[in-house]
Curated annotation (Swiss-Prot):
Species in which this protein is naturally found: Pseudomonas aeruginosa (strain ATCC 15692 / DSM 22644 / CIP 104116 / JCM 14847 / LMG 12228 / 1C / PRS 101 / PAO1)
Miscellaneous section: The porphobilinogen subunits are added to the dipyrromethane group.
One cellular component (GO) term of this entry: cytoplasm
EC number: 2.5.1.61
Pathway: Porphyrin-containing compound metabolism; protoporphyrin-IX biosynthesis; coproporphyrinogen-III from 5-aminolevulinate: step 2/4
Pfam families given in the database record: Porphobil_deam (PF01379), Porphobil_deamC (PF03900)
Protein name in UniProt: Porphobilinogen deaminase
Subunit structure, interactors included: Monomer.
Length: 313
């Protein structure tokens, strides 16, 4: 990396490119004269679209190729959706910036119905997420959940083709891509607790690039980072990836963080919940503590069953 050029590794989906362009614009605004270019790449998770995420297995489905570009020197930073970022990083890489969070909620999208409550019994709802599935079926066991993968445009097209009565997507992705009008209703975090890091964008780079860390500093949002740190600590203690029925969401209350966590049976028959509060400086310890509460309630058995069915740890 020259001191006046930064190369961004990014996935090729419309949402990933939006996030990379957002980081590019922020960097160029903060550092006039800086040249920022994009290096679009295809991840393993992007290639394997014919199976649910939980069946594919492994962590880092959407980031490993980008990390390879960093390690080989082909790129200087990688821009990720925080909910896709594994808890541990390859030697020589680290997460140095978390940008301000967009709406973290799940969105109900339908061409016929205004809300989840309005769906008739037997309606077909599309999602690729066991987390969403567990919470949906806990509220509405009369619904049919059908597998849904692909980028945002593909998922909307499948809904429009009549394959589903409704689909559930992250509100942040729809908002960022200009599809906010497709959101019929945003689902309260009380009814659908988000994935850890949902709605936040993270920037990964080489640990040795201290000059680059300084350039990234204006993009870092401390409030978001504290909240996401607690969420990721919970995920790490539960050995969770982006394809397991784990939910967690932290908010700041003055000088405290309030973290809620959930582990659910994919069929919705059991939802384990835990929560806790701690000073801002103890975000990581808070995540571990809430995770321990879930484990004491029996979360490990639920997660082991999911991992066993998927055929991976």
């Amino acid at each position: 990396m020259s001191s006046r050029e930064i190369r961004i590794a990014t996935r090729q989906s419309a949402l990933a490119l939006w996030q990379a362009e957002y980081v590019k614009a922020r960097l160029e605004q903060a550092h006039p004269g800086l040249t920022v270019t994009l290096l679009p790449m295809t991840s393993r998770g992007d290639k394997l679209l014919d199976a649910p995420l939980a069946k594919i297995g492994g962590k880092g489905l959407f980031v490993k190729e980008l990390e390879t570009a960093l390690l080989e020197g082909a790129a200087d930073i990688a821009v990720h959706s925080m909910k896709d970022v594994p808890m541990d990083f390859p030697e020589g890489l680290g997460l140095y910036t978390i940008c301000e969070r967009e709406d973290p909620r799940d969105a109900f999208v339908s061409n016929t119905y205004a809300s989840l409550e309005q769906l008739p019994a037997g309606s077909v709802v599309g999602t690729s997420s066991l987390r969403r599935q567990a919470q949906l079926l806990a509220r509405r066991p009369d619904l049919q959940i059908r597998f849904l993968r692909g980028n945002v445009n593909t998922r909307l097209a499948k809904l429009d083709a009549g394959e589903y009565d409704a689909i559930i997507l992250a509100a942040a992705g729809l908002i960022r891509l200009g599809f906010e009008s497709r959101i019929r209703s945003s689902i309260s975090v009380d009814d659908s607790l988000p994935a850890g890091g949902q709605g936040a964008v993270g920037i990964e780079c080489r640990t040795a690039d201290s000059d680059l860390h300084a350039l990234l500093e204006p993009l870092h949002h401390t409030d978001t980072a504290l909240r996401v740190t607690a969420e990721r600590a919970l995920n790490k203690r539960l050995n969770g990836g982006c394809q397991v029925p784990i939910a967690c969401y932290a908010i700041r209350e003055g000088d405290q963080l309030w973290l809620r966590g959930l582990v659910g049976q994919p069929d919705g028959t059991q939802l384990l919940r835990a929560e806790g509060r701690a000073p801002l400086a103890e975000a990581e310890a808070l995540g571990v503590r809430v995770a321990e509460d879930l484990l004491e309630q029996g979360a490990e058995a639920i997660l082991e069953a999911v991992y066993g069915e998927a055929g991976h740890p």
